[in-house]
């Protein structure tokens, strides 16, 4: 059966970028749209962004930005310790969302498994669990996919920082990739780092996608996966200067980081 899936990731409350890619998708006969996480966080328009996702039946997967809302930022001590503005942004983001929008975020799955034309595909924000793997999630440089070999279930909990032990217990009840090893899949597609990489580990294809709303480009980016095999990238012009102006005019935590990303396209 032919199937056409659109993939976005790391919108980061950039509603203008999301609007642009949705408009571009309209004539492409898309079956389903998946967001690979971080649809919120950083940007000034979390409510408008989530509303747009709901209205367009986007299936959103939880990333770390969603986890900061669903689990609460206090469950991630490194935020308050290392990035107080990101901590405050998580609280502010939560306060901007309506009950329906919060419900959408709370009910976002941590991963999705698809079988298309015999290909087993895992969709996630990152192949290591952003809810508790502090070390692995933040050190990846795009060069060492072997880091993804370990499982994300109770077998590994003791290896992680004690301060995130409670998070690991929560995550173990709803494990990333359903507790499977990456070798249980033919392909893993993910976001998180906002850069594009392609690796083959054993017989598994690992695709890292460019961010839709936060990327080293002035375009909004999305992908179409055709029949579980061909991954096509689309770059859509959008008014990022308007996003910069709106950022200047709105008062919200971590706005300087968002301005840097949008205007100068520097990632962290």
Regions found by a protein language model. Name each.
Residues 1-56:
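N-terminal active-site segment of His-dependent metallophosphoesterases
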Residues 1-6, 114-122, 200-204, 228-229:
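Beta-strand-turn-beta hairpins that frame and shape the catalytic cleft
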Residues 25-30, 116-117, 182-184:
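Glycine-rich phosphate-binding loop signature in dinucleotide/nucleotide-binding domains
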Residues 8-9, 33-38, 42, 60-64, ...:
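Active-site neighborhood of phospho(di)ester-bond hydrolases with catalytic His/Asp-centered motifs
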Residues 56-114, 137, 142-145, 149-153, ...:
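Active-site neighborhood of divalent metal-dependent phosphoester bond hydrolases
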Residues 197-268:
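Acidic, His/Gly-rich catalytic cores of divalent-metal-dependent hydrolytic chemistry
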Residues 135-142, 173-198, 203-204:
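Anionic-ligand binding region
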Residues 12-17, 41-43, 65-71, 129-130, ...:
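Active-site environment of divalent metal-dependent phosphoester hydrolases
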């Amino acid at each position: 059966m032919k199937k056409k899936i659109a993939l976005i990731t790391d919108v980061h409350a950039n509603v203008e970028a999301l609007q642009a890619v949705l408009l571009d998708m309209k004539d492409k006969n898309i079956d389903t749209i998946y967001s690979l996480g971080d649809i919120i966080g950083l940007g000034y328009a979390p409510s408008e962004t989530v509303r747009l996702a709901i209205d367009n039946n986007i299936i959103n997967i939880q990333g770390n930005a969603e986890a900061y809302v669903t689990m609460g930022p206090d469950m991630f001590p490194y935020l308050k310790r290392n990035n107080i503005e990101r901590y405050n942004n998580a609280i502010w983001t939560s306060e901007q969302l309506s009950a329906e929008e919060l419900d959408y975020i709370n009910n976002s799955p941590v991963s999705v498994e698809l079988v298309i034309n015999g290909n087993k595909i895992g969709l996630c924000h990152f192949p290591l669990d952003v809810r508790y793997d502090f070390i692995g999630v933040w050190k990846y440089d795009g060069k060492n996919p072997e880091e993804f070999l370990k499982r994300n279930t109770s077998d590994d909990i003791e290896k992680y920082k004690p301060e995130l032990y409670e998070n690991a217990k929560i995550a173990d009840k709803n494990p990333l990739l359903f507790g499977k090893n990456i070798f249980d899949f033919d392909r893993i597609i993910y976001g998180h780092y906002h850069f594009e990489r392609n690796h083959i580990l054993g017989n598994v294809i690992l695709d890292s996608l460019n961010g839709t709303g936060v990327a080293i480009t002035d375009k909004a980016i999305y992908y179409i996966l055709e029949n579980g095999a061909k991954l096509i990238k689309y770059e859509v012009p959008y008014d990022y200067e308007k996003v910069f102006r709106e950022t200047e005019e709105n008062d919200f935590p971590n706005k300087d980081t968002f301005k840097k990303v949008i205007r100068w396209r520097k990632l962290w």
